[in-house]
Amino acid sequence: MKKYWCWVMTILVLGLLALMSNAEVDIDAFESLVKNAPDEALKAYQNEIARADLAVTDLYQLHYLAVRASARTFNNPIFIKALDMLKAPPFKTLADEDRAKILTNIGVGYRRRNQNEQAIWHYRCAMNAPASLQHKSALKVNIAIAYTRLEQPAIGYNLLKSVDREMLPSFMQAGLLTALGNATFAMGEADTALSYYIDAATHYAKDENYRAVKQVSINSLGIYVLHSDFSSYHKMLADITAEPSLIEDNQHYLGWLRELVQQLEQNKQALTVSTTMKAYSLGAANAGYASMVNAHIDKFNLSLPKVTSQLTIRDPLPVELGKAWCPNR
């Protein structure tokens, strides 16, 4: 799997070089970079927008997609700059047509930074804008994710169950299934959650979103540990380690699992909670894995108090960045 991922990244980099050398911008290649290598996409973006020969539509698409990439990579300067560019007169008609999508991407930026109230504010703005049934469904998924992170999973679950899954393309089904997995696990239904996560990974793979496959698989790891299914745990972990940035982003949660599994595989009757494990439990909770850590504490009778999510707002964005597209709020 690691060799396969390296091959995929090689193809993406070659696509990046082609993107930068062509007389016209290959928007499809750029969008693929945004999906699978957002940091590389932003490097390409900064090179491409310096060109003087770009058509207005191509330049608009670069700014629009840069918002998506920077939302995921916490690159606030580019996020704000690209949004400001979308407000410029040459792009007004195009931006007005994409109002729901732009507001959604802004909401994703806030949610990634744990500014969940701002995320919901922008998603609800987007719900009031003209959009397809599919996009409205995606918005419900995003709103549900934000409510789940605010420890209100029941609200999120009810929203998710109102979505007609069969009407959605594969990549949207993947997002819906991931959100359902998170909500159902938070409500205490581990087996159902695992089924959702596995199904989501299959849909992400169909969409060639390999990073998302690994991200949702991280959620499955904790359930495999709950079930003492260490074979599946180690197999999935080996796949995830092919994406170093995911390891870094989830280091406390993965550290918690590693320490726990090491003891469980030794068949100890009473597990020892080290200072390191305590630190990992708090870090994992703050990264959004409180319900998973608490499930492990209960399952394995760990001498550790339950943890709560103290979500840290990471690199916060200014509020209401989408106000220009949401004048009535």
Which role does the model predict for each range below?
Residues 28, 65, 98, 105, ...:
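"A position-specific structural signal for the A-helix of alpha-solenoid helical repeats
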